[in-house]
């Protein structure tokens, strides 16, 4: 059964990037709004969405090609759903130390972290979107057409990224 009409790799990548930006960054936006209250900085807070979306989209467009697209997008959806749960609920920031800790955690410690809320995050932010990506019928264009689409998309996204960064450069610099 087909869930979606035929879609290009570029469009599918942009949709997944938008989904992840909108659903898996709750804690990030809560913290940003504490520093920059929405009432006083609505354009900057909204610009964060565009900034994250354009950054993630460019990164994904650079690595997603004909035969690896679904694998990468599905793996990313599953991982970000779980990471989002731990970030939203425990304030965990995933960096290289956290990844090292994952590999040294024993089974009993891991079982203590399981909950219905984690299952909810996994199903609705990871598993169901992953099934949709898996069932999506991708229109494969010629190599030249695919490269041209990616170049156009990446160029527009870099312009968006640079534009947002330049307009709000003082605000972005203060986040560092």
Briefly describe each language-model feature range.
Residues 122-158:
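Cytosolic-side transmembrane helix boundary signature
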Residues 49-61, 120-135:
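Hydrophobic cores of alpha-helical transmembrane segments in multi-pass inner/ER membrane proteins
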Residues 43, 114-119:
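Juxtamembrane/start-of-transmembrane alpha-helix segments at the extracytoplasmic/lumenal side
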Residues 112-115, 124:
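Internal alpha-helical transmembrane segments of multi-pass membrane proteins, especially GPCRs
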Residues 105-108, 134:
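Conserved, well-structured beta-alpha core segment at the onset of a catalytic domain
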Residues 1-104, 111, 154-164:
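Extended, compositionally biased non-globular segments that define protein topology
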Residues 166-176:
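Membrane-interface segments at or immediately adjacent to transmembrane helices
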């Amino acid at each position: 059964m087909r869930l979606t009409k035929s879609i290009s790799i570029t469009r599918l990548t942009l949709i997944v990037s938008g989904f992840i930006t909108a659903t898996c960054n709750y804690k990030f936006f809560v913290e940003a709004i504490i520093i920059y209250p929405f009432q006083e900085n609505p354009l900057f807070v909204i610009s964060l969405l565009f900034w994250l979306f354009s950054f993630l989209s460019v990164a994904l467009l650079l690595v997603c090609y004909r035969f690896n697209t679904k694998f990468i997008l599905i793996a990313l959806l599953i991982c970000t759903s779980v990471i989002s749960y731990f970030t939203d609920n425990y304030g965990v920031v995933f960096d290289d130390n956290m990844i090292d800790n994952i590999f040294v955690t024993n089974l009993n410690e891991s079982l203590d972290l399981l909950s219905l809320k984690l299952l909810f995050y996994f199903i609705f932010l990871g598993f169901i979107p992953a099934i949709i990506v898996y069932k999506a019928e991708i229109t494969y264009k010629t190599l030249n057409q695919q490269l041209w689409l990616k170049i156009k998309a990446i160029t527009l996204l870099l312009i968006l990224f640079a534009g947002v960064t330049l307009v709000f450069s003082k605000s972005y610099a203060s986040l560092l």
